[in-house]
Amino acid sequence: MLRLILPVFVAGTMYAQSAAQEKLADAIKSPQTTVVHLWAAWCSNCQAELKTGGWTKMINENPQVKFYFVSVWNDGQDGRAMLNKFGIAAQPNVTILGDPGPRRGENKIKQFAGLPLSWIPATWIYKGGDLRYALNYGEVRFPVLQQFLTDSQSEWSHKGEPSIE
């Protein structure tokens, strides 16, 4: 009996990555700082972030950072029209992707790029393949995001510091 249950369980937990996830998996390995912003055009919290102009300013003031706006739970639509409205889509350090997953139902994605996804907007900061910061539950505060970007430029080494022993 156990033999029959195990294959069904394993098959039910496996999933294929979307093209957006595959592209992002390669991008976050970059030695440069990379921001992944998971959002959807229908989401009022995501819209509120755009209306403040914070994303536009953040992108313009950090040309060395690569920003990925990934529309999720939006039936494959990438939200480019809305990002264009706020001057984000045409920026040279911005890539726009759309995950094909639906907004509702059993096929709604619950993880993206190997991390849990239960709320949008969510903003993740990577450097050299390492997740440096994850803001998972709501609108980002742009001064905080800027501090995280600044901190992510460091090597995070404690060499030469005195031991606490």
Regions found by a protein language model. Give the residues of each.
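A short beta-strand-turn-helix
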Residues: 17-34, 57
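Solvent-exposed loop/turn segments at secondary-structure junctions
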Residues: 40-45, 72-77, 100-103, 131, ...
